[in-house]
Amino acid sequence: MPKHSLEQIKEKITERSKKTRELYLENTFNPKNQPKIESLGCANIAHVTASMPEHLKMPLGSHKRKHFAIITAYNDMLSAHQPFKNYPDLIKKELQEHNAYASVASGVPAMCDGITQGYEGMELSLFSRDVIALSTAVGLSHNVFDGAFFLGVCDKIVPGLLIGALSFGNLASVFVPSGPMVSGIENYKKAKARQDFAMGKINREELLKVEMQSYHDVGTCTFYGTANSNQMMMEFMGLHVANSSFINPNNPLRKVLVEESAKRLASGKVLPLAKLIDEKSILNALIGLMATGGSTNHTLHLIAIARSCGVILNWDDFDAISNLIPLLAKVYPNGSADVNAFEACGGLAFVIKELLKEGLLFEDTHTIMDTETQKGMQNYTKTPFLENDQLVYKDAVSHSLNTDILRPVSEPFAANGGLKILKGNLGRAVIKISAIKDEHRKVKARAIVFKTQSEFLERFKNKELERDFVAVLPFQGPKSNGMPELHKLTTNLGALQDMGYKVALVTDGRMSGASGKVPSAIHLSPEGALNGAIIKIKDGDLIELDAPNNALNVLEKDFEKRGINPLFLETLENLEKPTFGLGRELFTSLRLNANTAEEGGMSFGIKV
């Protein structure tokens, strides 16, 4: 029955996407769009080879050697991206052993949401995904490559790279991760320190010491937020070397896995990206998201990725998959363990093995790990090891090594996935329930309406919020201010919840993938900038957030006939004006052209 249900969901998406998918494939494989170094003029070719070693110029210029692009998101500001500094040299060296070469075709921007969290720079975050996609396309537009490597890990970077890569879906492509940092202080201790600071129990110096014990090394943050959810999705889509996501950057195995990615692409056996990414692989990513309790941000990113290859995914599909897929993992913020502990007790190989065994994952997809004898997701049920300096794969563990972190399908943490879609007279919203205790999943309380995140924080500081309430924060959607994450609210709302108050958040903005314990109806659509119902809410309105029953409503008789709250009239009138400072004015056109959260919050208008 589950397999039948999964097939039904897939068929609905296939039918819905028939015209757009056909058009995407037609454009992608149009002969006019294929790599054409052989037909370039001699001056053009000379520009291609000018910076290359002398002995490679003629072989590459005459296409006697394969030439691959490297699109890198390397910088020193992101702990997860600093390891990419040396990856191009590792890739080039390995390719030389296979009569091939690679060029760094483009560097793309990569910002750290952990740095900008709660500040104005966060308003660039979502649209940085689109800038990364555009930058990726610019790098590949020389149109002289036989394939491409994509080096990226963090929140907006992987979705942006993949959206850009799909515009060159005729190229064989491999995504290369850097892995998580080694474990520092436990994530729950970090969260407690933040709450203690918010309540005035510890000082700034004490908090900084704790934070630096948590974020202390190269690699991704160790909680299961958007960055690590990205890595999971790349595995489930078959774009990583198998089970390379959660190997630490300085583990000797990491270097060998990077080299293996080069071997795979040089082999010529990796299919074009457009043939790897289809309805099944996208659904596999969504299944992985639900089974592991991944980030809410992918209710935006996965839709945007799908649209970039002609597949029309929507929140109803998320809801259907959530109702079908059990929750198999408890990784912070859904539990106390981090991704290193998750990897140690079985990791993604075990999750994939369990889902395949129960018919809850599409096995017959193409991946970069396909061989003549074995194709599909079975290749991702194996774990990499180093033996005598050689990469070997062994079957995943037969049972979880810690059932507090990872469980089989027969004994899940919950029968349903980690995300739900809420519906009601406010519109549609997303909620992550995997980290919310049962007693907090339903809240009925009076609204307190805020104009800004900073107003909330100030009123909390002044002890004005110590009561039951639903915080309402509109004009945080894509068209309003770029849809920043509002993770700073989590600490304060969590502190109030721990004091015994019934609290919740309703917003058209986003939360971090690290957010969790407080019930939050986010990505509310339509957003305030599109005259969504959220801007009709007034202080004192009774709101019910009922996650178990997928409901979100204002319980006031006059609500649906009511006009806009006068508090927001000025905000609504000024939406088309640029917001100056920190480069935000440069993003005005992206903001004004953005589509809805349920359409992926994209700014370059891919129409479906």
From Swiss-Prot:
The keyword 4Fe-4S applies. Its EC number is 4.2.1.12. Pathway: Carbohydrate metabolism; Entner-Doudoroff pathway. PROSITE patterns: ILVD_EDD_1, ILVD_EDD_2. Keywords: 4Fe-4S, Carbohydrate metabolism, Gluconate utilization, Iron, Iron-sulfur, Lyase, Metal-binding. GO terms for cellular component: cytosol. GO terms for biological process: D-gluconate metabolic process; Entner-Doudoroff pathway through 6-phosphogluconate. Binds 1 [4Fe-4S] cluster. InterPro entries: 6-phosphgluc_deHydtase, Dihydro-acid_dehy_C, DiOHA_6PGluconate_deHydtase_CS, ILV_EDD_C, ILV_EDD_N, IlvD/EDD_N. Its cofactor is [4Fe-4S] cluster. It comes from the Bacteria. GO terms for molecular function: 4 iron, 4 sulfur cluster binding; metal ion binding; phosphogluconate dehydratase activity. [4Fe-4S] cluster binds at C154, C221. The keyword Endoplasmic reticulum does not apply. It catalyses: 6-phospho-D-gluconate = 2-dehydro-3-deoxy-6-phospho-D-gluconate + H2O. Catalyzes the dehydration of 6-phospho-D-gluconate to 2-dehydro-3-deoxy-6-phospho-D-gluconate. Belongs to the IlvD/Edd family. This is Phosphogluconate dehydratase. The lineage of its organism: Bacteria, Pseudomonadati, Campylobacterota, Epsilonproteobacteria, Campylobacterales.
